[in-house]
Amino acid sequence: MNRGANSDSIPTDLIYEILSRLSVKPITRFRCVSKLWESIICRQDFTELFHNRSSSNPRLLIGVIQGGEWNFFSSPQPQNHYGKSSLVVAADSHMKFSEDKRPRYYSYASGLLYFPNIRISNHNDDVVRVICNPSTRQYAILPPDLRTRYRDSGRLFRNKLGVINLEDDYDGGYLLKLRMFVLEDFEKQKWTTYVHTLRDENKIKDNDNVYVVGATASGQIVLARNKAYKPFYVFYFNPEKSTLQSVEIQGVREEEDWFHRVYYFVDHVEDLRFDVMKTTYAATSIRPAEQNTSTSSREDHLVRTVKRKRA
């Protein structure tokens, strides 16, 4: 059967509408159906439409380091609690990468990840600086003359600076106290302090290392463990309503009983574009990463986390 001939008989407007309702994974596969489908997917109006629809449903991007590899997954972020204290969602698997030798220095912005020390086998095993799009499985290597111009770490923020302090408290049982210090007026150095008590005996145990990993555009504070075990939980705290919602994420390396360091990227927006290649620098390579089987980023707050035990 000639797939290209059959697809060309379908009205272009109908193909456009069908593709626009799909997630990024099948769309990237359908580029191979025919030249017509590829041309539609690469059209600027299509990529912009896809990005706008994805922006209304941001996801939680999860990076798991195990066996010398980054494994990327994503899951839906709860938009509204609707009175539910717990949810179960499925994770989508995206791509694998060799482990960055200095994983603490990664950066995230506009759906792209920057790694300063990635080893790629088909580049003479040299350690290189890489920018990748985990949704489309594309990556680009920074040219040598540009690699020294960027620091190994950095965050973007636009309006308010926030410091979140997470404390343990054993008064009458295990609980977490969340202290938020928000810079309301930069020139006057006016800070506002908010204190919240979090408790979920069924999901958070006294030996769990729970950290603040970010804040969503809707204002929810995201908490998670730095090393995850089955079941895999992420927690969303709404400061306005003082509600804590636990979300069990299924499909994250379920063949393993446990895995190593986990990193989280809040408000990830799937994007078909890889415009950083055109606007920032001339890339030496763009290719899908090998595999075995977007706000674009949170720009409203710069969040630092501190975790300590009370004496």
Swiss-Prot record:
Annotated CDD domains: F-box_AtFBW1-like (cd22157)
Q: Where is this region: Disordered?
A: 287-311
Report the superkingdom from the record: Eukaryota
**Gene3D superfamilies in the cross-refs:** 1.20.1280.50
Residue pairs linked by disulfide bridges in the UniProt entry: none
Q: What is the lineage of its organism?
A: Eukaryota, Viridiplantae, Streptophyta, Embryophyta, Tracheophyta
* All residue ranges annotated as the F-box domain in the record: 4-53
Q: What is this protein called?
A: Putative F-box protein At1g31090
Q: What PROSITE patterns does the database record attribute to this sequence?
A: FBOX
